[in-house]
Amino acid sequence: VPAARESLLDAACSALERRPWSAVRMVDVAASAGVSRQTLYNEFGSKDGLARALVRREADGYLAGVERALSGPGDPRSGPSDPHERLTATAEWMMSAAHDNALVRAMLTGCWSERLPSPALSAVPSSSAAPAQRRADGPLPSPGDFVGLVRDRAVAVLGGSGRSAPSDTAELARSCELAVRLALSCVAAPPAEGAVADLLRAVLPRRSTA
């Protein structure tokens, strides 16, 4: 049941904010969500399954946020604004979102503290009847995977109609990857406020921002 699943994930997230993952009890998560413990196990299979589902949801939410940042404000029919501005806004959003969410920060850097769940990134055997859990039991994105996922989304959004010359598309892809890698480095070692934009202005090819 999607609603019950989301309630359970919300409850697990709230529990994780208050105590280390090792101290989070399945029975408490179920009670907080207002469902039976059996419903919790039916949905996720195990505590590790719940951890994988949490990470999968945070990864999906983060990538959705990246797409919103890339699209920018205003009428979506008018197309994206200047690529440099959108890449800068996206890089700043990436850093801010990671700063505010320890689970996202761990996914992007690969540094999982003892307070957090740390499920294996490789796929695990799944016997779940829930499609969402079968997906969560599949491979989870590594920091390197995030670089490719965000870069490809940036190229798709900023490339517009896709009618650009191959050389322009390749340059855009390089600029997008550079912006993503710079943003992720800033997640690990945050710079001063506003420094991300200054760094991007210094390193992005001027032609790609026209």
Question: How would you name each of these model-derived features?
Answer:
Residues 58-90:
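Amphipathic alpha-helical linker/stalk segments
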Residues 34-44:
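Short hydrophobic/aromatic patch on the recognition helix
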